[in-house]
Curated annotation (Swiss-Prot):
Its EC number is 1.14.19.1. Signal peptide: none annotated. Stearoyl-CoA desaturase that utilizes O(2) and electrons from reduced cytochrome b5 to introduce the first double bond into saturated fatty acyl-CoA substrates. Catalyzes the insertion of a cis double bond at the delta-9 position into fatty acyl-CoA substrates including palmitoyl-CoA and stearoyl-CoA. Gives rise to a mixture of 16:1 and 18:1 unsaturated fatty acids. Plays an important role in lipid biosynthesis. Plays an important role in regulating the expression of genes that are involved in lipogenesis and in regulating mitochondrial fatty acid oxidation. InterPro entries: Acyl-CoA_DS, FADS-1_CS. The modification Phosphoserine is found at S203. It comes from the Eukaryota. GO terms for molecular function: iron ion binding; oxidoreductase activity; palmitoyl-CoA 9-desaturase activity; stearoyl-CoA 9-desaturase activity. It comes from Capra hircus. PROSITE patterns: FATTY_ACID_DESATUR_1 (PS00476). Its cofactor is Fe(2+). Belongs to the fatty acid desaturase type 1 family. Keywords: Endoplasmic reticulum, Fatty acid biosynthesis, Fatty acid metabolism, Iron, Lipid biosynthesis, Lipid metabolism, Membrane, Metal-binding, Oxidoreductase, Phosphoprotein, Transmembrane, Transmembrane helix. This is Stearoyl-CoA desaturase. The keyword Lipid metabolism applies.
């Protein structure tokens, strides 16, 4: 939505949200709807410190032959071995102890929140603010997930939003399901990804000591938190077999977290409906949201990347929003940005798929 259509309702309490509400009534009437005027319209974005996650429709791929794919054989081999180990882990499920299942569930949710509430909604999009204890928790959880450090993940994700479905999009879904799911990690980046990624403003990430600390010590952190700890805890504390601890609690769990995240890039860009903006590829996909703890409302998210819920409906199939709201209730999260129902409905009427329009 253009910046001049945004309105900010400012609250002095850190436990409330900053609401992006309705555009001017004349705009709504042009779109077929009517809403009352609101008292204040801002000329700037709801997040004046952030611009580079807003879709740029003016960017077009360069004409000419596409560069030849360069395979990264190290990644191909490691991903292959990981998924073979995960498949073997499936066969061990009947022999695992109940405490191991609970441990895997705990580690899955921690890893998922490190991606969704952490690197995605906090650091990539700055949709809310977090106090130091919460940021430390999320940086640890993000390291447990092992999906690149916060700096690199955020850079790629901002490029994905700004140059979506072009060669400058790191996991461009127009290159097919496999490429957008995992293939983009198995080949060298397209030159356009490097070129346009270098133009993004990442000063907020560079200025955050915690983010740069993680980046500096990422390899030993991942070795400890993604592989050693989840293997040793069940083996040492409740006598799980080392085989089950390694292949089920570690490799299978890690592979499932990876694929749940990847489905947001692949399935949620191809399968589902587009109630908010039919001109973009991202879709609403409930199944993806189940696995990715709330990240499947993707048409909404690409339309309103500044909404901390990444969804119109807050807690509906969205554990991440529930978690952030709990953190706000105890004072660890604040300044949550939320698009109002009026603004979402206005956008739906203007650009949504006809079958999704209502009211």
């Amino acid at each position: 939505m253009p910046a001049h259509l945004l309105q900010e309702e400012i609250s002095s309490s850190y436990t409330t949200t900053t609401t992006i509400t309705a555009p001017p009534s004349k705009v709504l009437q042009n779109g077929g709807g009517k809403l009352e005027k609101t008292p204040l319209y801002l000329e700037e974005d709801i997040r004046p410190e952030m611009r580079d996650d807003i879709y740029d429709p003016t960017y077009q791929d360069k004409e000419g032959p596409k560069p030849k794919l360069e395979y990264v054989w190290r990644n191909i081999i490691l991903m292959g071995l990981l998924h073979l180990g995960a498949l073997y882990g499936i066969t061990l499920i009947p022999t695992c102890k109940i405490y191991t299942f609970l441990w895997v569930l705990f580690y899955y949710m921690m890893s998922a929140l490190g991606i969704t509430a952490g690197v995605h909604r906090l650091w990539s999009h700055r949709t809310y603010k977090a106090r130091l204890p919460l940021r430390v928790f999320l940086i640890i959880a993000n390291t447990m997930a092992f999906q690149n450090d916060v700096f690199e993940w955020s850079r790629d994700h901002r490029a994905h939003h700004k140059f979506s479905e072009t060669d400058a999009d790191p996991h461009n879904s127009r290159r097919g399901f496999f490429f957008s799911h995992v293939g983009w990690l198995l080949v060298r980046k397209h030159p356009a990804v490097r070129e346009k990624g270098a133009t993004l403003d990442l000063s907020d990430l560079r200025a955050e000591k915690l983010v740069m600390f993680q980046r500096r010590y990422y390899k030993p952190g991942v070795l400890l938190l993604c592989f050693i700890l989840p293997t040793l805890v069940p083996w040492y504390l409740w006598g799980e077999t080392f085989q089950n601890s390694l292949f089920f609690a570690t490799l299978l769990r890690y592979a499932v977290v990876l694929n749940a995240t990847w489905l947001v890039n692949s399935a949620a860009h191809m399968y589902g409906y587009r109630p908010y903006d039919k001109t973009i590829n991202p879709r609403e996909n409930i199944l993806v949201s189940l696995g990715a703890v709330g990240e499947g409302f993707h048409n909404y998210h690409h339309t309103f990347p500044y909404d901390y819920s990444a969804s119109e409906y807050r807690w509906h199939i969205n554990f991440t929003t529930f978690f952030i709201d709990c953190m706000a209730a105890i004072g660890l999260a604040y300044d949550r940005k939320k698009v109002s129902k009026a603004a979402a409905l206005a956008r739906m009427k203007r650009t949504g798929e006809e079958s999704c329009k209502s009211g």
